[in-house]
């Protein structure tokens, strides 16, 4: 397996090194994105043109827009390569994000679940590695649940529950059914930033939520 984790850093997100033809790019590893998205300038560097097909896509804020599509010849990640990948194309301004420290969002591409789900991945926070290899199963043989993104089963208060893993989010989000299960719920104003739009909202939150994963808290 080849480590393709990028050295780029932004808000504890994961970034990978991508090779498209003779062009190198940095992509956000985003299991919450149904399709891979690239910036208009990256499409230009690839000397590719958008297609006539337009698809509707939403971001973290629920904003839905119509985006052009394009087919890029290949996406290479480490030693694996996906041919003829259809992607969404968005304006460069949609990637113009910065954090509280003034660091600039380093990616010009969102690597979506349409590509990620085709391969086998191994992540180690300790070793700072995200490795990829060919999968024993094709994307067509994934269960209906997994086709929407990876699922884990953490434990809270002695009970397991299903949670979807979205590596494009910087925080965990709970459904409304948790209101009656959690103590000390507070509210704060926060900015929800996503590709294409951001907004300030007053949201409930808990400072500490103890979950167990495979007998580890």
Where are these regions (language model features)?
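Pepsin/retropepsin-fold aspartyl endopeptidases
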Residues: 1-217
